[in-house]
């Protein structure tokens, strides 16, 4: 366990953005270990969680800023974004509006954080009630962002957004975790068939993208 700041080789501010209810807080609090600390900053209306990841470059700390519901009040204060080194933008695949609002969140974020690594994450892919299909998720391709399906409640692909961000921030594409992230027991088990179906849909979407056949966000089928 890392107990002190001297053991940490790098420290980064990571902000979570997206509509309320998409699962941002659940996503962060899946990390269950003594190295996870959470504190509330009243002046900003946010929770800041400290997550230490053990990598091939040493221990790296993320200070993860979560909105604490402030996004429901009509936007976030600039102080939320200032000094951010990276961001995870999250939507809920069972709610179309949360995906349609992603361009607004991206605009707010990049107005202050122009060139930080950003991962777009579609949460709740464990649900059979998905309203946002892989071929409809096109925003990341237009903005050259990384995208991952995740399920906070089943821990599906939990590590991938963090590992991608770490590689970007350190400039080391070969960086890896030397210890898995300690996670809470799953609330929902995803079947192998569900996972295979997700992969098949994303392979199909990638092929369509290469052929220039993916719909725009404004496409009628998405509204």
Curated annotation (Swiss-Prot):
NCBIfam families: small_GTP. Monomer. Found in a nuclear export complex with RanGTP, exportin and pre-miRNA. This is GTP-binding nuclear protein Ran. One of its GO terms (biological process) is protein import into nucleus. SMART domains: RAB, RAN, RAS, RHO. One of its GO terms (molecular function) is GTPase activity. One of its GO terms (cellular component) is cytoplasm. Its main location: nucleus. GTP-binding protein involved in nucleocytoplasmic transport. Required for the import of protein into the nucleus and also for RNA export. Involved in chromatin condensation and control of cell cycle. It comes from the Eukaryota. PROSITE patterns: RAN. Keywords: GTP-binding, Nucleotide-binding, Nucleus, Protein transport, Transport. Belongs to the small GTPase superfamily. Ran family. It is found in: Nucleus.
